[in-house]
């Protein structure tokens, strides 16, 4: 079990935690608007909640794509969100120099999938002492996540969450291996596993300069993943996904957040009400 703050704990056997928000900080107003709706819905449904957003999308496909406001402005917005709503925050870091200042503001640091094997960044994240969400690289098998976990533990941090965001299936497509969740649980000492349903819906136009997506399938994919029995769901929503500056094709429309989460909570409650059944 990983303690995110004084009231939220993350465990595969506990009620799921929602790591939800927007893809990238487009503006302070959008961050506050989105967080307000997440807080309203999660409080109504009784779902533990962590706000997520990126201050810099450092791995965009095109050099001309919007990346975000940068670290300094991003941290200011995060502080405003915390002051207004009192929620914990998760965000990703891409550079070693970002780890210390970001750790002063946010509650959970995130290691991006494309950078998950970068040892110096792993060590810098570990040294903050904060919980770290490790995104499973699309090119890595579930069992190989144990090597990244070992790096963190050797660097002195065992406050780890593992996140599946899909696996490469041929060119320009992602799939989610439902058996992989169990493999990660067994090979990584039952660390909390969360499912990034938004990014698992990405696909690509080979000639395109940005990722496409399949948001019309978010409900069935989220149900399938959470039916395994996971510690959390990682989700991005937007008031107008078609106008989002990043990953709009995969984002849940914000006005569908309540009915969507009501279904996910009902499923999570049902799955975790079953007695544990081990088959050798």
Swiss-Prot record:
One of its GO terms (biological process) is keto-3-deoxy-D-manno-octulosonic acid biosynthetic process. It comes from the Bacteria. It catalyses: D-arabinose 5-phosphate + phosphoenolpyruvate + H2O = 3-deoxy-alpha-D-manno-2-octulosonate-8-phosphate + phosphate. Pathway: Carbohydrate biosynthesis; 3-deoxy-D-manno-octulosonate biosynthesis; 3-deoxy-D-manno-octulosonate from D-ribulose 5-phosphate: step 2/3; Bacterial outer membrane biogenesis; lipopolysaccharide biosynthesis. Its EC number is 2.5.1.55. GO terms for molecular function: 3-deoxy-8-phosphooctulonate synthase activity. Belongs to the KdsA family. This is 2-dehydro-3-deoxyphosphooctonate aldolase 2.
């Amino acid at each position: 079990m990983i303690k995110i703050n004084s009231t939220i704990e993350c465990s595969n056997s506990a009620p799921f935690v929602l790591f939800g928000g927007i893809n990238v900080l487009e503006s302070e107003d959008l961050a506050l608007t989105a967080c307000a709706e997440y807080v309203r819905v999660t409080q109504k449904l009784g779902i533990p909640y962590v706000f997520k957003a990126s201050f810099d999308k450092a791995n965009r496909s095109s050099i001309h794509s919007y990346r975000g406001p940068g670290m300094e402005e991003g941290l200011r917005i995060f502080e405003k969100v915390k002051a207004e709503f009192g929620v914990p925050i998760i965000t990703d870091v891409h550079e070693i120099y970002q780890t210390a200042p970001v750790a002063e503001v946010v509650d959970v640091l995130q290691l991006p999938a494309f950078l998950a094997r970068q040892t110096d960044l792993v060590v810098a994240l570990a040294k903050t002492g904060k919980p770290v969400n490790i995104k499973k690289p699309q090119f890595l098998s579930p069992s190989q996540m144990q090597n990244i976990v070992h790096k963190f533990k050797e660097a002195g941090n065992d406050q780890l969450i593992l996140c599946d965001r899909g696996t490469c299936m041929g060119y320009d497509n992602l799939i989610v291996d439902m058996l992989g969740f169990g493999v990660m649980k067994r090979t990584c000492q039952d660390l909390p596993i969360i499912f990034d349903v938004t990014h698992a819906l990405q696909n690509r136009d080979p000639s395109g300069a940005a990722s496409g997506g399949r948001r019309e399938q978010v409900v069935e994919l989220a149900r399938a993943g959470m039916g395994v029995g996971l510690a959390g769901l990682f989700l991005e929503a937007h008031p107008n996904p078609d106008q989002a500056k990043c990953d709009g094709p995969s984002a849940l429309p914000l006005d569908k957040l309540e009915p969507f989460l009501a279904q996910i909570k009902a499923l999570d409650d049902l799955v975790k009400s079953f007695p544990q059944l081990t088959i050798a």
